[in-house]
A protein has these predicted regions:
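C-terminal motif of bacterial Sec signal peptides marking the signal peptidase cleavage site
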Residues: 14-15
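Sec-dependent signal peptide recognition
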Residues: 2-8
Length: 358
């Protein structure tokens, strides 16, 4: 597949006409390929991120309906540092999952295996295949009434502005128009959102226990007894939550502009309810309690715009607008989107395997 894409790219470039050397209009190149979403589609989620942290949203611009997307492209919130291991009461050792093999190097070598026969070796192998696993740091979405269904979200107009790294979502819910902007800080594990609605909805912060599964949304909602979320500090404009899962801890710092009330709805489930029709909040995830200054939505948005404009104006890009091959437009779209996804999902300090952070 990789060779096919390379061949198509070379063929399309050969079909391009360039009567004179001209600088590529990078802004036009990027913005004409901005993704747009017009339906609640589990395969059309959008993401913001910075390589160290990524946050994926549904058509509301937040993670309002994670259950709808769990079998498609799940709504993840993940970081490079966010790892967890289940307890190891049987005290399995790494060497118990290894077997000696002769690979023709003149001596036997240890190799990790998956024993099929029941016994301690299989149990040890199974434990190490599951642990450690990356954590879903938490769902951040609209808190809606129980009877609201995804189909009630109408007139969806959502776009990802890759030039500035911001998702803009417009929709109506029970005849109320909503306008939500979502952005990620380029250097912190932080998202920020701006909500505008005549009847503002609350914001839910719902924290799952991990599943340890391979192809799921990493959310176990049936294990509240195995983890906790504690409100460790709060004032009129901010709150800090401490998450504890077995031996793993991390912190969630929420701040907001305007009047709002944070309440604990149930175990590992908090709701922030604003009173103003326009409401903004940043939310930061950290492995330790953070002493960093609290930022505003405007500051996060400004930092994101500067970061992404620098990203797109540095390094190589490919403009297919002068190509005569009918496949050129689609190929250009895939190249630009791949550059964006690479930056948010795979360009961190430890590039993740396969699909990226979320």
């Amino acid at each position: 597949m990789k060779h096919t894409i390379y061949a198509l790219t070379m063929f399309a470039l050969a079909a391009c006409t360039s009567p004179q050397e001209e600088a590529i209009d990078r802004h036009a190149l990027v913005t004409r390929n901005n993704p747009e979403v017009t339906a609640m589609d589990s395969l059309s989620s959008l993401s913001v991120g910075n390589g160290e942290f990524a946050y994926t949203v549904d058509a509301t611009g937040l993670q309002t309906f994670p259950e709808v997307y769990k079998n498609g492209v799940p709504l993840g919130t993940q970081s490079q540092w966010g790892w967890h291991s289940f307890g190891n009461p049987e005290n399995y050792k790494p060497e118990e999952a290894l077997v000696e093999y002769d690979f023709g190097h003149g001596h036997k070598e240890l190799y990790a295996t998956q024993p099929k026969e029941p016994g301690r070796a299989k149990e040890a192998s199974d434990w190490y295949r599951v642990n450690p696993h990356r954590l879903h740091l938490g769902i951040i979405g609209l808190e809606l009434e129980n009877e609201v269904r995804p189909s009630d979200v109408q007139n969806i107009q959502q776009s990802l502005d890759m030039w500035n790294g911001i998702i803009t979502s417009r929709f109506t819910l029970k005849e109320t128009p909503y306008h939500i902007q979502t952005v990620c800080h380029p250097e912190r594990d932080m998202i920020a959102a701006r909500l505008s609605a005549r009847q503002p909805a609350g914001i839910k912060f719902h924290f799952p226990y991990p599943t340890g599964g391979h192809c799921d949304d990493a959310c176990n909602w049936e294990a509240n007894d195995k983890h906790s979320t504690t409100l460790v500090s709060e004032d009129a404009q901010s709150a800090v939550l401490k998450r504890t899962l077995d031996a793993t801890t991390y912190y969630v710092t929420i701040s907001w502009e305007g009047a709002a009330k944070l309440r604990e709805k149930s175990a590992n489930y908090f709701v922030l309810t604003p009173t103003d029709s326009v409401f903004t909040f940043p939310c930061q995830f950290t492995p330790q309690a953070s002493a960093s200054p609290i930022l505003t939505f405007a500051e996060v948005q400004q930092a994101s715009s500067g970061h992404w404009q620098n990203y797109w104006t540095q390094g190589a890009v490919a403009d297919f607008s002068q190509c005569t091959d009918v496949r050129a437009k689609e190929l250009e779209r895939r190249v630009v989107l791949s550059q964006y996804l690479l930056a948010i999902q795979c360009a961190g300090s430890t590039p993740p395997q396969e699909t990226g952070l979320t």
